[in-house]
Amino acid sequence: MVKLVFARHGESEWNKANLFTGWADVDLSEKGTQQAIDAGKLIKEAGIEFDLAFTSVLTRAIKTTNLALENAGQLWVPTEKSWRLNERHYGALTGKNKAEAAEQFGDEQVHIWRRSYDVLPPAMAKDDEYSAHKDRRYADLDPALIPDAENLKVTLERAMPYWEEKIAPALLDGKNVFVGAHGNSIRALVKHIKGLSDDEIMDVEIPNFPPLVFELDEKLNIVKEYYLGGE
């Protein structure tokens, strides 16, 4: 039996300010830093030992991964970064205050953009200050792969190749895996792992803390699912 641990990044400065973040590269808040440290302590207390770690290319997830592994006494664990684990791209909503967006577009419309499985928010302009098209970390990526907006369906579609090529093979090889990522990229993978319907996944929330653990059998069927610390 293997363990797959998902840790959503700790609270970010934009989480704190109630802003849509998506692919914008925002740092952890002081609270978020402590959440990442505490995640590592919970991992250590649980006696979980990792063989591999995966994270996104966004600072808040990378820092959470590093702090969690460090405080679990496992900073040495090989870690791979991929844009495919990035947060869902919120398009033109990126950087907007969620309450102000609701005032501008209406509560119902913003709720649909945030919570529906397959409705896209307005696209981000390629010359937007937060556009990934001019971000050096994506310089080697085919521009056609860089999104201007995503829903959960599209997020799952771009995360799945990474699951199938990297994460699942490691688990099938008997390795314990840590994934430090984002609320929606984790939700997308949880939908796949649990076989949830499009409607069922909409009620699933991934908190910034504590980490979510899946114990899986040799065919990656779920044996046990729980949050560390009993929360």
Curated annotation (Swiss-Prot):
Protein EC: 5.4.2.11
Active-site positions on this chain: 9, 87
Entry's Gene Ontology molecular function annotations: phosphoglycerate mutase activity
Family annotation (SMART domains): PGAM
Positions of substrate binding: 8-15, 21-22, 60, 87-90, 98, 114-115, 183-184
Transmembrane stretches, start-end: none
Record site feature (Transition state stabilizer), residues: 182
SUPFAM superfamilies recorded: Phosphoglycerate mutase-like
Pathway annotation: Carbohydrate degradation; glycolysis; pyruvate from D-glyceraldehyde 3-phosphate: step 3/5
Gene Ontology BP terms: gluconeogenesis; glycolytic process
Top-rank EC class of the record's enzyme: isomerase
Catalytic activity: (2R)-2-phosphoglycerate = (2R)-3-phosphoglycerate
Keywords: Gluconeogenesis, Glycolysis, Isomerase
HAMAP family cross-referenced by the UniProt entry: PGAM_GpmA
Function text: Catalyzes the interconversion of 2-phosphoglycerate and 3-phosphoglycerate.
Family: Belongs to the phosphoglycerate mutase family. BPG-dependent PGAM subfamily.
Protein name: 2,3-bisphosphoglycerate-dependent phosphoglycerate mutase
Organism: Streptococcus pyogenes serotype M6 (strain ATCC BAA-946 / MGAS10394)
Gene that this sequence comes from: gpmA
